[in-house]
Design a protein with these regions (language model features):
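Conserved PLP-enzyme active-site core in the AAT-like
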Residues: 1-162
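Conserved PLP-binding catalytic core of the aspartate aminotransferase-like
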Residues: 160-173
Length: 173
């Protein structure tokens, strides 16, 4: 969390929108909980809320930490640094061209309304359930332990180049 907070501060100092690649957001929250001082007693949801509070926008494939069979997200903070940086304003400060509206028009003409993004109701409900499940500490702990078990097994079997400790979604060799 410290690196996210400090990176956001630097980006904002130079008026650069701070964007997160949030494909593994829940996994990152788990490692923050386990490794950073002051987070041990916080829930994954509380950590996620803080983590996303520092960004001006994020992208994520929701097939990963969303447990969905499809879907992704591109999100921007309303009237945040991204909006200020890429919208055009008149001399009096009123809005001339709103980048949010431009993106919404592109979204609707390409993928469907921004409230569903061409996803079926079933897929949206599966995604909602998956996002909820990813906030379960026991699930995340089991996932990390499975990766460590596999990585340590490879290492003990003499596989060269196993990266230890393993992450939370795969084993690197």
């Amino acid at each position: 969390m410290k690196s996210i907070r400090e990176t956001a501060k630097i980006a904002h100092k130079y008026e650069i929108p701070f964007m997160l690649d949030a494909a593994r957001w829940a996994e990152n929250c788990y490692f923050i909980k386990m490794n950073e001082e002051g987070y041990r007693d916080k829930s994954i949801a509380e950590i996620a809320k803080e983590m996303f509070s520092y960004c001006d926008g994020f992208t994520a494939s929701l097939k990963k930490d969303g447990h969905a069979n499809m879907g992704g997200i591109l999100a921007f903070r309303d009237k945040g640094y991204f909006w200020k940086k890429f919208s055009d304003f008149n001399e009096d400060g009123s809005i001339k061209t709103d980048v949010g509206i431009l993106l919404k028009v592109k979204q609707i003409s390409s993928y469907g309304n921004d409230s569903y993004g061409s996803m079926s109701g079933r897929d949206i409900m599966a995604l909602a359930a998956g996002l909820y499940e990813c906030c379960n500490f026991n699930y995340l702990q089991e996932r990390v332990e499975q990766c460590n078990y596999l990585a340590e097994g490879f290492y003990k079997a003499g596989v060269k180049g196993v990266v230890l400790p393993a992450g939370g979604h795969g084993v690197y060799i």
